[in-house]
Curated annotation (Swiss-Prot):
Lineage: Eukaryota, Fungi, Dikarya, Ascomycota, Pezizomycotina
Record organism: Pyricularia oryzae (strain 70-15 / ATCC MYA-4617 / FGSC 8958)
InterPro entries from the UniProt entry: Cyt_P450, Cyt_P450_CS, Cyt_P450_E_grp-IV, Cyt_P450_sf
Keyword rRNA-binding included in the entry's annotation: no
Region (Disordered): 1-21
Keyword Oxidoreductase (UniProt): yes
Function: Cytochrome P450 monooxygenase; part of the gene cluster that mediates the biosynthesis of a tyrosine-derived cytochalasan acting as a fungal signal recognized by resistant rice plants and leads to avirulence in Pi33 resistant rice cultivars. The first step in the pathway is catalyzed by the hybrid PKS-NRPS ACE1, assisted by the enoyl reductase RAP1, that are responsible for fusion of the tyrosine precursor and the polyketide backbone.
GO molecular function: heme binding; iron ion binding; monooxygenase activity; oxidoreductase activity, acting on paired donors, with incorporation or reduction of molecular oxygen
Gene3D superfamilies with a match to the protein in the record: Cytochrome P450 (1.10.630.10)
Residues the entry annotates as binding heme: C451
Similarity annotation: Belongs to the cytochrome P450 family.
Protein name: Cytochrome P450 monooxygenase CYP3
Domain of life, source organism: Eukaryota
GO term, biological process aspect, one: secondary metabolic process
């Protein structure tokens, strides 16, 4: 079935069908259906509507890029991501962790601020200047060095010189959970296996609860779900374990704030989201309230970063033609880090221009989602050209279509690892970084509501790839280098989960600082 085009409102539909209209088709063929809609409608600036397998959201409206500016400027009481998530994941019934403004703020401001002092005299750093007020910038790479040291320590303790067989996602997810936790709770809790299990389980428990509700209750009876022990037990266990682990850290940070007349002074002691949440304007700053925000941050960060990194690993294996030049760039950067006493700064991260471009191209060709900027309308809205969206409608932008539009990216099906580096050199040095967002780069969203954790995520993934380029060996257990097909599911996709990797540490090498 082709997507259905819209006229001036969502009630004006044309119904040309060319195939079955069952839910299964919209689960397994979403990417191709969206591509058809992009070519037939979105390229001409026309919205269209197609079935959404998530029944709670109703049919989804797919908007063309010309509406991006209006959506980016719209207030959250008009177009809401929180309301979209609430319906998509049944948050009112599952009681899964929710986003809070404080959690988003501390990632957007406090966390990114502590990634390093953003030097302004290199064009490579201009992207950070655009995204952050300069007055908030401090700490010369302190957190970046912490992330690097923990990444080296984790891998050194996990792998030895003997080949180990591991499922590919397990390799990356364990790394991401451990290193992300440096920014969430710091050492030593980031090394606690129970904590690392919790941050991995939170997403699966939340999605599992939503699916169990759909399976057990019709829409009329879902109000019973919060009292269902079978549905709530995993999330209750996770909350209980998290509170027990976080309590000593919570009390330490509260005491430090109480002792210090200067919050700035106590911030030198702690560089983690737990501390920043305690000192934030979050209404509920009790231990349970802070724990809830911490669980949301893990839900938002761990599996999206892991899936993206998993995809990078497959593309790295599939494209050995780029290994030599990127490895040379990495070694040059590591040499500069050593000259700085082993301390990383964002200057060093910005030297990895070829690696950054490789990652952005991998994410363009093999994204983890086909749409972005998902919103739910809380009020009716009429766009400048007269197109009307009523209240109670979910809409998205087709990021995968934008990223495969030949007007944006010539020869769009070709994997060109240096495509974005060339664009930085010839078009705009500030627009084509991995973490940058623009009207032609929608993977992280758009505007003020773009993913606030993308800078942290980018650094963690770069550190994994650097470690494996220089101190480890990694290859497919089944042999060869060809990337296996992704697993598509509705608007999302995932790198093939059936793949096993052979991993070992190279003899006599270590990047541990």
């Amino acid at each position: 079935m082709l997507p259905r085009s819209l006229g001036h409102s969502t009630s004006e539909l044309s119904p040309p069908f060319d195939g079955p209209n069952g839910v299964e088709r919209y689960v397994s063929e979403t990417r191709s259906l969206l591509r058809k809609g992009y070519e037939k409608y979105l390229r001409r600036g026309v919205p269209f509507q197609m079935r959404n397998p998530v029944e709670e959201l109703g049919a989804q409206v797919v908007l063309p890029p010309k509406y991006l500016d209006e959506v980016k400027r719209a207030p959250t009481d008009l177009f809401s991501f929180e309301a979209y998530s609430e319906k998509a994941f049944l948050l009112n019934y599952s009681r899964a962790p929710r986003q809070t403004e404080a959690a988003a703020h501390i990632v957007r401001v406090d966390l990114t601020r502590n990634l390093g002092k953003l030097i302004t005299f290199y064009s490579d750093f201009a992207i950070f200047e655009v995204c952050l007020p300069l007055v908030l910038i401090r700490d010369l790479g302190a957190l970046v060095t912490d992330l690097w040291n923990e990444s080296a320590l984790y891998l050194d303790k996990t792998y030895n010189s003997e080949w180990q067989t591991k499922q590919a996602y397990e390799v990356v997810c364990g790394f991401v959970a451990r290193v992300t936790s440096v920014a969430m709770v710091g050492a030593p809790l980031c090394r606690n296996p129970v904590w690392n299990r919790i941050v991995v389980e939170t997403t699966m428990a939340s999605f599992g609860a939503a699916q169990a509700i759909k399976d057990k209750y019709s829409a009329r009876w879902r109000w019973l779900a919060p009292w269902s022990e079978s549905i709530q037990k995993d999330l209750r266990r996770i909350r209980k374990e998290s509170i027990e682990l976080l309590k000593p850290l919570y009390e330490d940070r509260k005491a430090a704030v109480s002792r210090s007349d200067d919050v700035q002074g106590s911030s030198e002691m702690f560089r983690d989201t737990l501390y920043w949440l305690i000192t934030s304007n979050q209404k509920d700053r009790s231990l349970s309230g802070i724990t809830e925000s911490q669980l949301f941050l893990s839900l938002a960060a761990i599996h999206t970063t892991s899936a993206t990194l998993n995809s990078f690993v497959y593309d790295w294996i599939a494209h050995p033609e780029y290994h030599g030049e990127i490895l040379a760039e990495v070694k040059e950067t590591l040499a500069q880090v050593q000259l700085n006493g082993g301390k990383w700064t964002l200057q060093h991260v910005a030297m990895l221009r070829k690696l950054d471009s490789f990652m952005k191209e991998s994410a363009r060709i093999n994204p983890i989602g086909f749409v972005s900027i998902q919103r739910y309308t809380l009020k009716p809205y009429t766009f400048k050209d007269g197109f009307q969206l009523p209240a109670g409608v979910s809409f998205v932008f087709h990021s995968d279509g934008v990223h495969h539009d030949a007007d944006n990216y010539p020869d769009p099906e070709k994997f060109d690892a240096y495509r974005h580096l060339h664009l930085r050199e010839t078009v705009d040095p500030n627009r084509f970084h991995f973490a940058s967002v623009s009207d032609s780069a929608l993977g992280f969203g758009a505007g003020n509501h773009a993913c606030p954790g993308r800078f942290l995520s980018a650094i963690i993934m770069k550190f994994f790839l650097i470690q494996f380029m220089t101190a480890y060996e990694m290859k497919y257990e089944h042999g060869g280098i060809e990337r296996l097909p992704n697993h598509d599911n509705s608007n999302t996709t995932a790198p093939n989960r059936t793949v096993n990797l052979l991993v070992r540490r190279c003899d006599g090498t270590s990047n541990n600082a």
